[in-house]
Amino acid sequence: MASENMTPQDYIGHHLNNLQLDLRTFSLVDPHNPPATFWTLNIDSMFFSVVLGLLFLLMFRSVAKKATSGVPGKFQTAIELVIGFVHGSVKDMYHGKSKLIAPLALTIFVWVFLMNLMDLLPIDLLPYIGEHIFGLPALRVVPSADVNITLSMALGVFILILFYSIKMKGIGGFTKELTLQPFNHWAFIPVNLILEGVSLLSKPVSLGLRLFGNMYAGELIFILIAGLLPWWSQWILNVPWAIFHILIITLQAFIFMGLTIVYLSMASEEH
């Protein structure tokens, strides 16, 4: 619910501010007077992404330790369904041989899903706790709505793409792929390099921006509903949007995982 001393514009702007650390002075940034510098760190995005990553590890480790060949419990059944789903996706999409791809795909899917799931929390709950209990000037709780997080994950995928390309094709084969495709003639090397370079760089950029754009839009809609409507009428739009958003957060986690598998499969193909 919007604070009584805030206009709707102030309320929306307040919820779109990250809790930032100025890396030059190691002090918290005033969201109303941010410094004109690149050297800031979004502490809230880092904190929640790390916590959710640890939660993923603890959940799966707990199930692995308690796994039984008998009748599984509900939680174990849910985890097994997720693992089976990811394993089937990797089997269908990845055509190379690597023991890394399935664990990587599982980590990406569950981690991104958990980060997206934070969008379903009441919009004012954690920011209110952060402000009134810990004295934080701002707090955003959806890591995947921060372009720094999504592009960082995409950068990790890009490094793996380069690694598998060089591993499977060698430096020479990878260089030929960039310079002799699609036109197999030395005269077209500059053109090929531009085309293939743009194609290669567009993969991580589109991967990160797609997830960020969808989650930022979803977060913004929740903020608009909470900031512009009276509290007693918010549920009329919030409930249907939250139900629809469950599909979106799951789909976006799957798309990020699926594209990662496809890109790594393409990188692993020998020409």
UniProtKB/Swiss-Prot annotation:
Gene3D superfamilies: ATP synthase, F0 complex, subunit A. One of its GO terms (cellular component) is plasma membrane. It is a multi-pass membrane protein. GO terms for biological process: proton motive force-driven plasma membrane ATP synthesis. SUPFAM superfamilies: F1F0 ATP synthase subunit A. The chain crosses the membrane at residues 38-58, 100-120, 146-166, 220-240, 242-262. It is found in: Cell inner membrane. The keyword Ion transport applies. Key component of the proton channel; it plays a direct role in the translocation of protons across the membrane. Belongs to the ATPase A chain family. This is ATP synthase subunit a. The lineage of its organism: Bacteria, Pseudomonadati, Pseudomonadota, Gammaproteobacteria, Enterobacterales.
